[in-house]
From Swiss-Prot:
GO biological process: cell differentiation; eating behavior; locomotory behavior; mammary gland involution; positive regulation of transcription by RNA polymerase II; regulation of transcription by RNA polymerase II; stem cell population maintenance
Function: DNA binding protein that function as transcriptional activator. Is essential for normal postnatal growth and nursing. Is an essential factor for neuronal neuropeptide Y and agouti-related peptide function and locomotory behavior in the control of energy balance.
Gene name for this UniProt entry: BSX
Protein name: Brain-specific homeobox protein homolog
SMART domains the UniProt entry points to: HOX
Source organism of the structure: Homo sapiens
Length: 233
């Protein structure tokens, strides 16, 4: 009987027992992390980070930064000041939505449409204005009914017509008056005298002339009475 007492075979440990020697500490260095190219990291991050309409990325939401996603039914009781909510950062729009945009003439007073009167209506209004500048309410109603107009249209027309009339009066008063010139030659005595003198000047002959005194009148009688000699005038 062969009794061989052999010690049980223990698998040789490939690992050296840990000790506090410097050699053992330096032997078990932590493995360096695998280097990742920056371009690969940027592309992978850009695919997970949403972009705004104008090209600037938002900060990643907590669901992207957290290693383990939260349960959808679980809501956080607090918000970290340096993290954004799941809805992202509220960014105001650069241009307002056309539906909510303020219209340019919203607060401005809308201009009313101008009323166009017919020739017969204008003629009736002008005739009444020549007679009466101001109308009472019953008179306006009566005139509006006769001309197929509303009371407001008649009232507005009379107001504008009075303003136009006042402007015309003011313009006529501001215009300088022409200075009073000499009266016409026919209507004034000086003019008649000047005309007579002009006619007399035209009837005179041209050149110098001498006025002579008239001779004494001589009665011609009988030849004997005058004498025998010749009589010289």
């Amino acid at each position: 009987m062969n009794l061989n007492f052999t010690s049980p075979l223990h698998p040789a440990s490939s690992q050296r027992p840990t000790s506090f020697f410097i050699e053992d500490i330096l032997l078990h260095k932590p493995k360096p992390l695998r280097e990742v190219a920056p371009d690969h990291f940027a592309s992978s991050l850009a695919s997970r980070v949403p972009l705004l309409d104008y090209g600037y990325p938002l900060m990643p939401t907590p669901t992207l930064l957290a290693p383990h996603a939260h349960h959808p039914l679980h809501k956080g009781d607090h918000h970290h000041p340096y993290f954004l909510t799941t809805s992202g950062m509220p960014v105001p729009a650069l241009f307002p939505h056309p539906q909510h945009a303020e219209l340019p003439g919203k607060h401005c007073r809308r201009r009313k449409a101008r009323t166009v009167f017919s020739d017969s209506q204008l003629s009736g209004l002008e005739k009444r204005f020549e007679i009466q500048r101001y109308l009472s309410t019953p008179e306006r109603v009566e005139l509006a009914t006769a001309l197929s107009l509303s009371e407001t249209q008649v009232k507005t027309w009379f107001q504008n017509r009075r303003m136009k009339h006042k402007k015309q009066l003011r313009k006529s008063q501001d215009e300088p008056k022409a200075p009073d010139g000499p009266e016409s030659p026919e209507g004034s005595p000086r003019g008649s005298e000047a005309a007579t003198a002009a006619e007399a000047r035209l009837s005179l002959p041209a050149g110098p002339f001498v006025l002579t005194e008239p001779e004494d009148e001589v009665d011609i009688g009988d030849e004997g009475e005058l004498g025998s000699g010749p009589h010289v005038l």
